[in-house]
Structures are given as structure tokens and as C-alpha cells.
């Protein structure tokens, strides 16, 4: 059993540093990537304010396949280059979207989502998954959130 003391009201830099430490503790010694993604998705869901979906899409062949998540049921498969997640997977670059309605080709898995942050998880220079965060609020995510999730993605890349 894991118990974490994470102050969701702390400055974002502190919050993300603690999330990375907690994710490390949760995944340390566990070889199963699905179990590790499930715990990380739950950790993000519990401690990130104002989110309505947290989770992973895994790279399988040339598309993204739904992985462990928290939130409403989601799209199961996303082709590379389609929507925010597919764009992140294809480019290998973080996608910070303040208003999903303004994103060309946005895939609306949850009509309540207004903003989105998608960060590629890289291993040996190749995208192996993406971390997807959705919020019902416009402009929920900023560069500090992107940096925090990018740090998390780098920290867990060998465990998922």
C-alpha cells in the first residue's frame, strides 16, 4: 500500500517534483508496464486539479491504442497524425492546447474537455506512448505543466 502526501495547492514546480518522486516509488521494481501506467494515471488523476481525464495511449504498430486511464470511456485507437494525441505521437513533440475546439482535427472523446496536454514518452529516441491530460477548463495547462509532465515522461520511460 502506498500513501503519498502531495499538496495539490503547492506551486506547480513542487507538485510536479513530488509527482515524479511518487511515480518512481510506485513503479520501482515493478516490471509490468500496464500496472505502472495504471498507477501513474491514478496518481495524476488524484493530485492534478481540474482534470477530467488522465491516462496513456500506447504505440502499437503505426497507431495509438488506449492504455490505462482515469475518466470517462475514451477512443480506443488513434492514428498517428490525427487529433492532439496522434499529432504528439507523430511529431514526438508536446502538444499544449489551450482550446481544443481551435485544434484542427481534434478528436472529441469527451465533449466536456476544453483544453488538453499531450506529452510523448520516448525511449531511445522513439515514441512508445503518450501521456494525455484533459480539462473541462479553457487554458488549464501552461508551459509549467508541460515541463512537469515531460519530466515525468522521461523518468518513467524505462518502466512502461
Description of each model-found segment:
Residues 48, 109-113:
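Short loop/turn motifs at secondary-structure junctions and domain boundaries
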Residues 115-122:
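A short, aliphatic-rich beta-strand micro-motif
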Residues 53, 118, 130:
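Short hydrophobic/aromatic beta-strand element in the GNAT-like acyltransferase core
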Residues 122-135:
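Sensory-domain boundary capping and coupling elements
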